[in-house]
């Protein structure tokens, strides 16, 4: 009888243990499911190409890419091929940049008569035109765009991984900042021809000395408005897509991305975004010192007002410098964006880069020989002479290390002509100390429209700053989810709630079971 009671008691204990084990297994399974759902996501996709690599190992030091024979050796050619080859090129340069590029192009075809270059001019940067052509297998063989747009194309498998074609020593020819802009997951997908960012251009006739803080900016703009009856500032925040506004967002303490549970996620819905939006709203509608221009750049309303002496301050990049130089001459000034008085932080523009990429054979239909010719071309148009020519003709900031050092030497020695250009370029180069890295991850492609839609509604008075901040982040997140760049993040608490609920259901059953056994 005692044996039977002991046996039944052991059965009760074993039942309890089994039930507890079941609960533990369920909890572990729940945690496993959670991490499976939140960890499998493409935060920064890698790409590969099936094309044949031509990387050589003979160049351990940076090669002389101004030497035609060296360029052919870099792509595995010992002599010019007997059959001529044609490469198609999409060019996104401005008119002043094209003056320099056309000189470089003429020199290239003289050095490489077996390569014929068909150029399409005036292609806009950051457009979907290339992607559409690539998916139809009709992309140009060579394409010039910004590093962030290029990153999205590389992640989509539409442009070559140059690290598989060129030795690492080649990439040392460029400024580290510039080549990093063209690197994703350790792979280089383009060769930079400049570095760029926005600065504050001002008319010295109205503003003898540039503001260092936003408080000074407001004060100066009010004085200009009152004294000269022109706009103190022309900044069309409602028209842009967040390229220039990112500088002010950073100045108020914001950042476009953050990381949650290992995922790259948008961080636009923040106090920093609300304050940055409200700042420019106040300058426009409360102080009446900013003109909300309907178009940006030298050819837009902002630039035209500046050229016509109808506004004292604008925010633009060196790519439009030539137009402002011609109009204002020695009255043109350039300086870094001011410190945001509320935070003590500099307004920090994107430090980005433009450069040259090569389409995959699948995107363009290029033959192996055309790929070699394309590699020679992008190496040539980013070499020392070509990059220095862009600096001297269009005032682009060189990405080539040797050209950059020459430009700095010219600047320090005051050799730029006209003489007042030296001070202007000093102000432009100073801005590089206060910038932020331009995100080149695929997620960045979905920032622009998200910002534009809700910033436009905000400045039109349809929504408030909080609603704009929330709306642009929601749109951003939705776009990332739809394009497979973000998985729906499940917060940890539900797992523990589920586990707790299951344990509450099962543990009473254990107790009841044990009680029944004891009664038996």
Set out the residue ranges of the language-model regions.
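Secretory targeting signatures
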Residues: 1-66, 490-520
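A structural signal for short loop-to-beta-strand junctions that line the ligand-binding cleft
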Residues: 132, 139-141, 169-205, 343-349, ...
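Hinge/lid segment of periplasmic solute-binding proteins
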Residues: 67-79, 147-199, 209, 214-220, ...
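Conserved N-terminal structural module of periplasmic/extracytoplasmic solute-binding proteins
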Residues: 54-152, 156, 343, 463, ...
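Extracytoplasmic/periplasmic substrate-recognition and gating elements
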Residues: 116, 286-287, 325-402, 433, ...
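Long, aromatic- and glycine/proline-rich binding clefts that accommodate carbohydrate-like moieties
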Residues: 335, 392-453, 457
């Amino acid at each position: 009888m005692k044996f039977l009671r002991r046996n039944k008691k052991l059965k009760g204990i074993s039942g309890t243990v089994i039930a507890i084990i079941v609960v533990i297994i369920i909890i572990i399974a729940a945690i496993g499911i959670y991490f499976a759902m939140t960890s499998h996501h493409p935060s920064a996709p890698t790409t590969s190409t099936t094309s044949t690599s031509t990387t050589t190992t003979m160049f351990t030091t940076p090669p002389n890419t101004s030497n035609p024979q060296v360029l052919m050796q870099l792509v595995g050619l010992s002599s010019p091929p007997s059959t001529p080859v044609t490469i198609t090129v999409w060019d996104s340069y401005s008119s002043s940049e094209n003056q320099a590029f056309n000189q470089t192009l003429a020199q290239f075809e003289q050095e490489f008569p077996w390569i014929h270059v068909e150029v399409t001019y005036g292609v806009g940067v950051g457009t979907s035109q290339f992607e559409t052509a690539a998916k139809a297998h009709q992309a140009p063989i060579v394409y010039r765009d910004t590093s962030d747009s290029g990153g999205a194309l590389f992640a989509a498998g539409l442009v070559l991984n140059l690290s598989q074609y060129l030795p690492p020593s080649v990439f040392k020819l460029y400024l580290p900042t510039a080549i990093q802009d063209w690197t994703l997951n350790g792979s280089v997908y383009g060769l930079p021809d400049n570095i760029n960012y926005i600065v504050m251009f001002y008319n010295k006739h109205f503003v003898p000395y540039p503001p260092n803080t936003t408080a000074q900016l407001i004060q100066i703009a009010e004085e200009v408005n009152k004294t000269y009856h022109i706009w103190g500032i022309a900044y069309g925040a409602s028209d842009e897509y967040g390229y220039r506004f990112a500088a002010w967002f950073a100045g108020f303490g914001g950042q476009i991305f953050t990381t949650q549970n290992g995922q790259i996620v948008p961080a636009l819905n923040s106090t920093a975004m609300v304050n940055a939006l409200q700042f420019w709203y106040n300058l426009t509608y409360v102080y009446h010192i900013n003109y909300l221009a309907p178009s940006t750049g030298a050819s837009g309303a902002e630039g035209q007002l500046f050229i016509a002496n109808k506004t004292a301050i604008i925010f633009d990049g060196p790519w439009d410098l030539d137009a402002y130089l011609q109009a204002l001459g020695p009255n043109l000034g350039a300086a870094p964006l001011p410190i945001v008085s509320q935070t003590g932080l500099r307004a920090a523009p994107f430090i980005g880069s433009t450069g040259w990429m090569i389409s995959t054979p699948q995107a363009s239909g290029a033959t192996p020989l055309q790929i070699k010719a394309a590699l020679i071309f992008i190496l040539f148009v980013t070499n020392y002479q070509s990059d220095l020519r862009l600096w001297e003709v269009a005032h682009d900031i060189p990405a080539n290390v040797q050209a950059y050092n020459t430009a700095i030497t010219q600047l320090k020695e005051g050799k730029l002509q006209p003489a007042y250009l030296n001070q202007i370029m000093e102000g432009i180069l100073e801005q590089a100390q206060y910038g932020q890295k331009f995100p080149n991850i695929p997620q960045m492609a979905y920032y622009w429209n998200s910002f534009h839609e809700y910033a436009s509604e905000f400045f039109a008075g349809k929504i408030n700053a909080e609603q704009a901040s929330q709306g642009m982040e929601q749109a951003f997140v939705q776009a990332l989810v739809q394009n497979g760049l973000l998985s729906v993040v499940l917060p940890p608490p539900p797992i523990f709630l589920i586990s707790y609920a299951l344990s509450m259901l099962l543990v009473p059953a254990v107790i009841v079971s044990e009680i029944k056994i004891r009664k038996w």
